[in-house]
Amino acid sequence: MRNHILTASSLADALGKGHFKTQLDLMIAKTSTEEAPFISNNIIEWGVKYEPIATSFYEKMNHLKIVEFGLVPHPKLTIFGASPDGICDLDSPTDYVGRMLEIKCPPIRKFTKEVPYHYWIQMQGQLETCDLEECDFLQVKLFEYDSDDRYNEDISYN
């Protein structure tokens, strides 16, 4: 389904403000009659690997539970959908109920105080699709130790 609809994550590309595809490449991909295979890369795999850890961190930090929904079709625009990373459930503190969460775990991108514009566009598409008003943008920098010795060095109190 995702191959033939515009999703919030590709909205910035559609507007010519993205970093991943040109408008022409996106149009060709979305209008092709063939199913395009999903092409992963190291950055995507890193995010998939660490997003659950970031979600758990957010849940514990804010004393709430995040619910995942997968691809949510827009209620009116049949050619649009969004896959938010999660939405705070009804048992969350009152000021968090219905708040959306967008997570990025970039292995190499530098963090800034502002949400990168192409991600802000993505979040606006997600909020519109889900008819919500707020979205927290969580960036998490994680790294892996290459050895037990390196880890032990890092945690020693000497």
Regions found by a protein language model. Name each.
Residues 1-49, 53, 144-146:
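Charged, glycine-rich intrinsically disordered N-terminal tails and low-complexity linkers that flank
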Residues 60-84, 88-158:
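Nucleic-acid nuclease catalytic cores
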